[in-house]
Structures are given as structure tokens and as C-alpha cells.
Amino acid sequence: MSTKPIPEGYHSVTPVIIVKGATRLTDFLKKVFDAKVLMSYSGPNNTILHSEVLIGNSRLMIADAGPVFGAQTGSYYLYVDDTDAAYQRALAAGAKSEREPTNQFYGDRNASVVDEFGIRWSMATHVEDVSHEEMERRMKAMAPK
């Protein structure tokens, strides 16, 4: 039996978030996106050396910042079943609103929040299939005159 270059359950790209407070970030993701903890390895002083959570069908690796790797965050776009509900859960979990739920010209209803670590979480529900031609038309209509 040969070993696969990408392990079972992983995708070609797996985001890694490193923060001071990995446990708090994991709690936020569980509350907002129903994240499931797949594995977690503890380090000294109640830190997380490495953990993996599953959000929908995608893995996210999380760790506490330390002397080897400092904080590394980013911006993430997640598809969810209900943008409005996820947005409300994010606010209830302490995130700050960046954009309220809105239907976008490209067919997604999305919103974005920023958590206590400065991570931008954009959540979206695809509500309309938009052809390439229609998207171009809508973009031109939105362009400044």
C-alpha cells in the first residue's frame, strides 16, 4: 500500500492560525461555526502546541504563539448554511461587525466580523448562480461614473 501525498481528510491548502490564546480562538470557532476539534496537543503553561478543527468539510490548524512562531492570523471566507445566523453568533461571541449581512452582486449573501485576535471572518451563503456575463454587467453598473 502506498502513502498518499495528501492525507485522508485534508485538502491541498490547509490554513494555519497562530495566536496568543488558541483555546479562546477554538471556543469562538465552536460557537460561531460549529467547529469540531479533531486533535489537540497541549504544551507548557496551558498552551496549545498544535490542534486541528473541522469547519464544514475543511480543516484549520491552530496553535499558540511562542518563541519559534509568532502570531500569524489572516482573513478567511467561509461558506455557511445561514449567513445571518452565523453573523449573530459571531457578535454574541464577542466579534466586532465589519459588514452586516448583505446580498452581493456575485450571488453570495455575506457579512464579515473581526475577532479579538484581529482575524477577519467573512461568512457567506450562496443564494444565486450568476453567469459571467451577468456579473460583468452588474460590475459595470456599480462602477463610478
Task: Mark where each language-model region is.
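Core segments of cupin and vicinal oxygen chelate
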Residues: 7-9, 16-59
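Intrinsically disordered, low-complexity N-terminal regions enriched in serine/proline/glycine
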Residues: 9, 40, 76-78, 105
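A short beta-turn/loop motif at secondary-structure boundaries
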Residues: 43-46, 68, 104-105
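Vicinal oxygen chelate
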Residues: 1-8, 12-20, 50-54, 63, 65-145, ...
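Long alpha-helical scaffolds
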Residues: 22, 32-35, 83, 90, ...
